[in-house]
Amino acid sequence: MASLRYRRFLKLCEEWPVDETRVGRDLGAFIRQRVAQAFREGESTQVDDPDACDEMYASLNRMNTNYYREKYPRLQDTSFTEVTAEEYKMVLASDNLKQMEEMKKGMWKRLRDKFNVKPSEENS
């Protein structure tokens, strides 16, 4: 029975897309890591709580098959801010987040980072 669960989770991992623009923050990559941790021994792994494992698989599978998107259809593909899903993807990309963090830095911090001055050298 554990081998069946393992194969179902592997199939789910294959179907779940990985967003390369969200390095370290992608749900697909996180799910793959968790499956690798939970099934370290592959098909011979013993599952401690089979009911919880099956429930987790069912929940992830519903998300993967867009069950809730079809059950609760939206009239428009925008949020309350009138921003589309594509615009959200662009804003939440790791490259854009790095640029925004760089913009948040003050002028002195940017210059110090640019010239690689360490705080201890600054005081001496």
UniProtKB/Swiss-Prot annotation:
InterPro entries: UQCC2. Signal peptide: none annotated. One of its GO terms (cellular component) is mitochondrion. Residues 1-13 form a transit peptide. It is found in: Mitochondrion matrix, Mitochondrion nucleoid; Mitochondrion. One of its GO terms (biological process) is regulation of oxidative phosphorylation. Its main location: mitochondrion. It holds the Pfam family UQCC2_CBP6. Keywords: Mitochondrion, Mitochondrion nucleoid, Transit peptide. It comes from the Eukaryota. Required for the assembly of the ubiquinol-cytochrome c reductase complex (mitochondrial respiratory chain complex III or cytochrome b-c1 complex). May play a role in the modulation of respiratory chain activities such as oxygen consumption and ATP production. May be involved in cytochrome b translation and/or stability. This is Ubiquinol-cytochrome-c reductase complex assembly factor 2. It comes from Xenopus tropicalis (Western clawed frog). The gene is uqcc2.
